[in-house]
Amino acid sequence: MLVPIAHTTHVVLAGAWFGGVVFTMLVVSPALGAMKWDEAERVGVRAVIGRRYALVGGLNLALLAVFALADGILDGFGQALYAEYALLPLLFGLVAAHGAFFGRRLATLAEAERGSASAEEAASFARKRRSLQRMSVKVSWVNLAVSAAVLALAANT
């Protein structure tokens, strides 16, 4: 009786995580880009969304790890679960780096850009921010790929 519950919960949590990543990349980011705000304001709004998402997403990832382990304990460990277990720390690292490093640094640069004393100083902060945003987008795509792999592995255990 516990095996199907653990497995179903495991797959649902992997799907919820993947769905959240897809929604953020394909809905939230383009919607923020369409707003008539300057980039610094957009980054500030994204930081607020990111802090809120971190609470929900962090809980989702923690439960995903617990139920992935429960799935293996209750129904046996196989290659798909071992592969998923190898990807989960990578996923946790990507998420932590994205929020802790990119999110905070982008918010700091946006705030510095808004509070700049000169146009030249603002332009310098804007260049740094755009460079960091490009790197952040690359990390987001890796996160999406790893999240898709985790979902596929969870569904095939």
Predicted segment positions?
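Polytopic transmembrane helical bundles with strong interfacial aromatic enrichment
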Residues: 1-157
